[in-house]
């Protein structure tokens, strides 16, 4: 149980090796934890608003965060200093490094008369001059705003999930949409996470389902149904398992008891689409989930402001579906 945030968690992420766990929340200060024993290593102090998203690069050297103070910041992971702060015209909802770590993408909200836009920046030699530089690519979103984002294979495409349930793939060289999923989801997409090999990804949606999609064709492969909005979903790196987390909207939380089981982490079989386990823990909806890269534990961040790291026992690995 990691206690270091004063307000609800918005996103959590492991680095590639899994020794560090990053968390951000609405309290303006992203944290980094040592995942093995839950020791807090430090905070990244500099944002003036709720931090909505974060990502760490392949080498665990840079961290990118996006916040409601209308900035995207790039940090030095080890020293906690701001390398660059990029101003935007509305709050930043998603941010991700590419696999190579040479580029980063972020998207802004449709708010205050501004349309939602997707930006691409070159972060190879990132320094304070990045705030004055023009982004390498800028794509306005005419229809629905972006609520989650992933990099596609080989850093050639970006996959975006939208507020109306659409998923699209953008070719970053041409700067245009190449694939559109249509209406597999009937409500907004809260989260998208890739499988370990990048061939597929799982979505979490307000329409009470999580779905598995092919990363290139956006073909819907599997669907995992629940009774309430899904806020986050993650794919196990070693087993055919998916974990979903959710609950109702934050404003309805006080009207239900925790016994109703609405705030559990729910485990589904990736292929058979069957739920086989639930884990309790949070006193409110789960906002973000992440599997440890070795697949032996997972972390969840909730509306209650806690991050919980849960390690699986041996029976979890023996639970083979017949």
From Swiss-Prot:
Q: Which Gene3D superfamilies match?
A: YVTN repeat-like/Quinoprotein amine dehydrogenase
Localization in the cell? Cytoplasm
Q: Which GO terms describe its molecular function?
A: RNA binding; translation initiation factor activity
- InterPro entries, from UniProt? eIF3i, WD40/YVTN_repeat-like_dom_sf, WD40_repeat_CS, WD40_repeat_dom_sf, WD40_rpt
UniProt keywords, alphabetically: Cytoplasm, Initiation factor, Protein biosynthesis, Repeat, WD repeat
Q: Name one GO cellular component term.
A: eukaryotic translation initiation factor 3 complex, eIF3m
Q: Where does this protein chiefly localize?
A: cytoplasm
Fetch the PROSITE patterns from UniProt: WD_REPEATS_1, WD_REPEATS_2, WD_REPEATS_REGION
Keyword Repeat on this protein? yes
Q: Name one GO biological process term.
A: formation of cytoplasmic translation initiation complex
Q: What Pfam families does the database record attribute to this sequence?
A: EIF3I
SMART domains on file:
WD40
Q: Where are the WD repeats?
A: 4-43, 46-85, 141-180, 184-223, 281-322
Q: Which family does it belong to?
A: Belongs to the eIF-3 subunit I family.
Its job: Component of the eukaryotic translation initiation factor 3 (eIF-3) complex, which is involved in protein synthesis of a specialized repertoire of mRNAs and, together with other initiation factors, stimulates binding of mRNA and methionyl-tRNAi to the 40S ribosome. The eIF-3 complex specifically targets and initiates translation of a subset of mRNAs involved in cell proliferation.
Quaternary structure? Component of the eukaryotic translation initiation factor 3 (eIF-3) complex. The eIF-3 complex interacts with pix.
Question: What is the name of the protein in this document?
Answer: Eukaryotic translation initiation factor 3 subunit I
What is the native source organism of this protein?
Drosophila yakuba
Its lineage reads:
Eukaryota, Metazoa, Ecdysozoa, Arthropoda, Hexapoda
